[in-house]
């Protein structure tokens, strides 16, 4: 996918850079593979704001994407690649030989007409194929990696992301994540071959505030420009620096403060993403 820039006929067009989606399917999604999605606007069931700076945006239909890939040893053909408003990656519509259809995350270099297969045994190392980590060659680039067998892929699902399988140890696979973290995952967990599509997503420039509003994002207001009643950094005469270490609106430390508390899974992290890069 290439990037697309525009003639500056308006001030916002001057900065606008988007992903050229000309090669994607332009019709509606398969109705049987969609669900309704109501906009929450950052509110909970009491109507109170639980996530700030959300609301509005275009109505969306949720596409049911198969992250589990547990339809083993049934070959599928990629019908088309589609845009999905609910995620940064593209999705692929797959029709299996038994007639069933499913959406999967589209990896890079997957095109309409390609064959994909998922198995609990070793299969070809081709983009879109899925198999347990214990059968994937060391050094492979993978995505949509499970953390628990059967739970469905959780790691590397965003546009352009991938994980590298760097080794094996006592039934566990050693993975290197984009963040630099190295962690252990059980060898029976499934993973798909290749990196996730739409790697140019990180290079887009919205060009105007309205594009964020179309996505349901409202202006993100800094604490230092608020009043003291609204934020610990608020108030003061003229511009201030906040006068204290950065905190959330509720007074908890933020900006670099470690928040991970799941000590039971610490043993699976071989190298923290916070360790100094060598």
From Swiss-Prot:
Recorded GO CC terms: large ribosomal subunit
Subunit structure: Part of the 50S ribosomal subunit. Forms a bridge to the 30S subunit in the 70S ribosome.
Gene: rplB
Origin organism lineage: Bacteria, Pseudomonadati, Pseudomonadota, Alphaproteobacteria, Hyphomicrobiales
A GO term for molecular function: transferase activity
Function (record text): One of the primary rRNA binding proteins. Required for association of the 30S and 50S subunits to form the 70S ribosome, for tRNA binding and peptide bond formation. It has been suggested to have peptidyltransferase activity; this is somewhat controversial. Makes several contacts with the 16S rRNA in the 70S ribosome.
Transmembrane regions listed in the UniProt entry: none
Keywords in alphabetical order: Ribonucleoprotein, Ribosomal protein, RNA-binding, rRNA-binding
Annotated segments matching region Disordered: 201-278
Keyword Cell wall biogenesis/degradation included in the entry's annotation: no
Protein source organism: Agrobacterium fabrum (strain C58 / ATCC 33970) (Agrobacterium tumefaciens (strain C58))
UniProt-listed SUPFAM superfamilies: Nucleic acid-binding proteins, Translation proteins SH3-like domain
Entry protein name: Large ribosomal subunit protein uL2
PANTHER family in alphabetical order: LARGE RIBOSOMAL SUBUNIT PROTEIN UL2M (PTHR13691:SF5), RIBOSOMAL PROTEIN L2 (PTHR13691)
Family note: Belongs to the universal ribosomal protein uL2 family.
Any single GO BP term: cytoplasmic translation
């Amino acid at each position: 996918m290439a990037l697309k820039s525009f003639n500056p006929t308006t001030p916002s067009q001057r900065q606008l850079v988007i992903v050229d989606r000309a090669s994607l399917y332009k019709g509606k999604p398969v109705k049987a593979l969609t669900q309704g999605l109501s906009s929450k606007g950052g509110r909970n069931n009491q109507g109170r704001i639980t996530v700030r700076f959300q609301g509005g945006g275009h109505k969306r239909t949720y596409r049911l994407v198969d992250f589990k890939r547990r339809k083993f040893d049934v070959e599928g053909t990629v019908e088309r690649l589609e845009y999905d408003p609910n995620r940064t990656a593209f999705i692929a519509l797959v029709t299996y030989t038994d007639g069933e259809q499913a959406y999967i995350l589209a990896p890079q270099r997957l095109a309409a007409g390609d064959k994909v297969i998922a198995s609990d045994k070793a299969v070809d190392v081709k983009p879109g194929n899925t198999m347990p980590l214990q059968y994937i060659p060391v050094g492979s680039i993978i995505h949509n990696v499970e953390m628990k067998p059967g739970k469905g892929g959780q790691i590397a699902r965003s546009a352009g992301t991938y994980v590298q399988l760097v080794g094996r140890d006592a039934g566990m696979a050693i993975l290197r994540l984009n963040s630099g973290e190295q962690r252990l995952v059980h060898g029976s967990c499934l993973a798909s071959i290749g990196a996730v599509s739409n790697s140019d997503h990180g290079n887009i420039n919205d060009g105007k505030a309205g594009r964020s509003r179309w996505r349901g994002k409202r202006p993100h207001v800094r604490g230092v420009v608020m009043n003291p009643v609204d934020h610990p950094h608020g108030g003061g005469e003229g511009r201030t620096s906040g006068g204290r270490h950065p905190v959330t609106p509720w007074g908890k430390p933020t900006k670099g403060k470690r928040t991970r508390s799941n000590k039971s899974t610490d043993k699976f992290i071989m190298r923290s993403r916070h360790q100094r890069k060598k």
